[in-house]
Each structure stands twice: as structure tokens, then as C-alpha cells.
Amino acid sequence: MNEKIAVVTDSTTYLPDEVKEQLRINVVPLSVIIDGKSYREGEELSATDFYRKVKEAENFPTSSQPAPGEFIHLFENLKEQGFDTVISIHLSSGISGTFQNAASAGELIEGLNVVAYDSELSCMAQGMFAVKAAEMALANEPLDQIIQKLDKIKQAQDAYFMVDDLNNLQRGGRLNGAQALVGSLLQIKPILHFNDKQIVLFEKVRTQKKALKRIEDILQKAVQNKTAEKAYVIHGNDLAKGEAWLAQLEAKFPEVTFELSYFGPVIGTHLGEGALGLTWSIK
């Protein structure tokens, strides 16, 4: 008899509600703290509300990971529903303790095999793992094949972000003050990416147009190497900017399936409003 596998992820995937429902993906929320008040991402605070509240806030927002107890409660619940195995897929362990909390909680549940999976990224780049794992679990595919597929996606995957304002990264501890000041004066648009589970500076470019062109050049190589079959354009509360880039990319790369996503509250605390990202991998 096949094992019954459940898929868990966290709110930083920013998956559409209909996808979560259709694929039965369980989501544990991270929280954002604005002026001392904590909001559960996606449950008590939408992306639109977050960016509005940040403009009115006195202090810079911070984020917090789910407590191990949240995972224990969910895992126990899934066990009661008859699941034998849980694949728990989370944002990079290099930027959050969420993955570690899921892994620790999983060890405490008897009679349930919890496999914690570090996406080493976040946002829809992480969402791609959750979607694929859930599709395969619903098709009754075995655990080892699901993990093998996730590893193949990880091998092919890449993600680049361009931020509009360096101050958020500096305040979030991602960039020092001098670099942020120089960046603001020179109108530098830094391109960031994930390297060894951390968000790091990839290149400094003078204009947004040049930054987007540079990311497109990297995508071009990935398309040639057959590692970019599906891609997501991700925007920070700027739908028009996201849609415009999406249209350009669809025209330029007809062989790639593109979709639009967004940076929600937790990731928005680091990247800020107006950020743009692109992630891709195999299907």
C-alpha cells in the first residue's frame, strides 16, 4: 500500500489560494511586526495592507518565524488525518530558522515521517518545490521519487532580484550603511541572488533597465542549457511593473512558461516596495 504523503510549506511562497486548495498544500505562516503589533502573514495581513502600513509606521518592520509548537500542532493534525509522511518545504535556512523549527518539531511526532526540505530560496522559487511535491503526492508517487524531483528542480533553479531602494536591505542587516548611501547617491540598482542559502549582492547596475537586461541575459543562458522551462516574475507591490516585464519576457522567450507572483510582507521587509525578481527552473 502506498504511503499517504502531505505537503507543508510556509507563507513566504505566496502561492495563490486556489493552488493551495487544489493541491492540498498546508501553510504555516511567518509573522511581521509593525510598530510592536504582530500580524500572521497571509492570515491577518495581506501584501497590499502591509505596504500601506509600512508607509504609515514609525519603526522599520521586522519578521519572525513560526514557533515549533505551530508545526507540532499541524503535524499531529495531519497524522490524525491518516498521513504517514509529511514533506515540509521552507524558505532558506540561511535567512530564517523556519526550516530548523519544522525539522525539530518533526522529530517529536511519533508514527509520522517528517522530511524537512530546505528550498535554499524563498517566494515563488520556493513555491515551485511545494507545487511539484503536492502534484506528485496527489498522484501517489513515492517519497524517494518526489525528493529526487525536488533535487533536480533545485539543481536547475536560479533566482535574481532587483531592489528599488537599498535602505531596506541596510536596515534589515543585509547591506552596510556606506554602501546604501553610495547606492542612493549614484542611483545604483543592485542585483541580488541567493548564494549558499544567503541573499548576496550579485552585481551593481546603474539603471533598472540595465538590471532587467542583465537578468534576461542570464535567463537566456539557462534557456540554452534547458534549465529554464517555467519562470515567475515577482513584484513588490507594483503590479504594472511586474506585468510589463512579464509581457516583455513572454515575447522574448516563447519556450518558457511565465507566471506572475509577488513579494509579500515577510520578504517585503527586506526588499522593499518596487522590487522585481525572476526565478526559473525545469517543470
From Swiss-Prot:
Signal peptide limits: none
Function comment: May bind long-chain fatty acids, such as palmitate, and may play a role in lipid transport or fatty acid metabolism.
NCBIfam families, sorted: DegV
Key word Hydrolase present: no
Keywords (A to Z) from UniProt: Lipid-binding
Annotated DegV domain residues: 5-282
Name assigned to this protein: DegV domain-containing protein lmo2514
Ligand binding (hexadecanoate): S63, S96
Organism, as annotated: Listeria monocytogenes serovar 1/2a (strain ATCC BAA-679 / EGD-e)
GO molecular function: lipid binding
Residue stretches spanning the membrane: none
Source taxon at top rank: Bacteria
